[in-house]
């Protein structure tokens, strides 16, 4: 039995998760009997019910599962809590660390029908865009020790530590090279080797691994500031973009914006064993929660990534992705991706349309 922990969370999470599970079951067909979907509380709703953003029973549910399908967490209601008790820091970050979800895959796709939704000129986008940002997720300056604040007055200071081991760099680089082999066979590694010692080491390790195991894959390097510019002026040069944690955090958000809607973008966070957490790239959007207008496509595509990476069900994953493309081509859109001539529909209608193409 394939167990999936379903953590809908807060805001629009429950309503888009409902659509994703329905699409998932339709795509699986008779194979749905091989799956068990078990729900757990996480984030703000978990705080309200248990006092903790990641209750022990939810963590146990995840440990007994093969994958986590995650919605979104957070909202104004919980913003005044201590940082470690807030939904994202108290739930999502501990889940990543607990399961060693070191590889974050963030596709940034612009479908031809949606190229006018991008803030980037249509002549730059051409007939669409397909970039995969590969971000190291459990190391670097976000987790490095020591960190803290000391002193007082004009002598007060704060510090963080940016640190990477050879093992951490090699394992994320391997995922990038392996992903590139299934795409357009090109990796762009991002660093700041003209300033940072960790970046010098990062670049050295990536080059060594490339020569030893992946010489068939095209490899090039960009400083992070240049990469941020190139994503805007010439995004089609990229296939797989390999980044350490902080650089990947920034560049993946930039890449998501050039697609025109963050409501379209899924993500996968994977461990070495293949265990994964799958979630939309956007937030909980409390301002539109419960109104039936949220775009469920990112959650649906996250479910497709789960089938691909945690269960090796490529055919079913492709079916969902094809159904999403056909839905977009039909001209019916949620309001975040609507343009002149398209028909604006709600969350449930988009879900029904996706299912009609399965």
Swiss-Prot record:
Binding positions for NAD(+) per the UniProt entry: 75-88, 283-295
Cofactor note: Binds 1 Mg(2+) or Mn(2+) ion per subunit.
Cofactor(s) named in the record: Mg(2+); Mn(2+)
Alphabetized SMART domains for the sequence: Iso_dh
Any single Pfam family the record assigns to this protein: Iso_dh
GO BP terms, alphabetized: L-leucine biosynthetic process
Gene3D superfamilies named among the record's database cross-references: Isopropylmalate Dehydrogenase
Compartment list: Cytoplasm
Disulfide bond annotation, renumbered to this chain: none
Keywords attached to this entry: Amino-acid biosynthesis, Branched-chain amino acid biosynthesis, Cytoplasm, Leucine biosynthesis, Magnesium, Manganese, Metal-binding, NAD, Oxidoreductase
Binding site for Mg(2+): 225, 249, 253
NCBIfam families tied to this protein: leuB
Subunit note: Homodimer.
Protein name: 3-isopropylmalate dehydrogenase
Source species of the chain: Leptospira interrogans serogroup Icterohaemorrhagiae serovar Lai (strain 56601)
Organism classification: Bacteria, Pseudomonadati, Spirochaetota, Spirochaetia, Leptospirales
């Amino acid at each position: 039995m394939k167990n999936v922990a379903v953590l809908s969370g807060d805001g629009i999470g429950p309503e888009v998760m409902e659509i994703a599970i329905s699409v998932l079951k339709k795509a699986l067909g008779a194979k749905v009997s091989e799956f068990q979907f078990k729900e757990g509380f996480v984030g703000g709703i978990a705080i309200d019910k248990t006092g903790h953003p990641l209750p022990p029973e939810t963590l146990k549910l995840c440990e007994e599962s093969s994958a986590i399908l995650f919605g979104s967490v957070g909202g104004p209601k919980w913003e005044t809590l201590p940082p470690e008790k807030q939904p994202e820091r108290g739930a999502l970050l501990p889940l990543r660390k607990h399961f060693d979800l070191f590889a974050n895959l963030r596709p940034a796709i612009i479908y031809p029908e949606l190229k006018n939704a991008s803030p980037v000129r249509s002549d730059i986008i051409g007939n669409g865009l397909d970039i995969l940002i590969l971000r190291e997720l459990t190391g670097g300056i976000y987790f490095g020790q020591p960190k803290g604040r000391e002193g007082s007055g004009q002598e007060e200071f704060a510090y963080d530590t940016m640190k990477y081991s050879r093992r951490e760099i090699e394992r994320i680089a391997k995922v990038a090279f392996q992903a590139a082999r299934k795409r357009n066979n090109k990796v762009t590694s991002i660093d700041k080797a003209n300033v940072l010692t960790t970046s010098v080491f990062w670049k050295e390790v990536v080059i060594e691994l490339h020569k030893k195991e992946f010489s068939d894959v095209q490899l090039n390097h960009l400083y992070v500031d240049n990469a941020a510019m190139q994503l805007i002026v010439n995004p089609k040069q990229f296939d797989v973009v390999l980044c350490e944690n902080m650089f990947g955090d920034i560049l993946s958000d930039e890449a998501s914006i050039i697609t025109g809607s963050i409501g379209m973008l899924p993500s996968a966070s994977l461990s070495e064993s293949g265990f994964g957490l799958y979630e939309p790239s956007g937030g909980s959007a409390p301002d539109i929660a419960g109104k039936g207008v949220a775009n469920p496509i990112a959650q649906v595509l996250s479910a497709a990534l789960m089938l691909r990476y945690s269960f090796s069900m490529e055919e079913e994953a492709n079916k969902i992705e094809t159904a999403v493309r056909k839905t977009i081509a039909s001209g019916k859109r949620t309001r975040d991706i609507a343009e002149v001539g398209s028909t604006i529909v709600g969350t449930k209608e988009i879900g029904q349309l996706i299912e009609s193409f399965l």
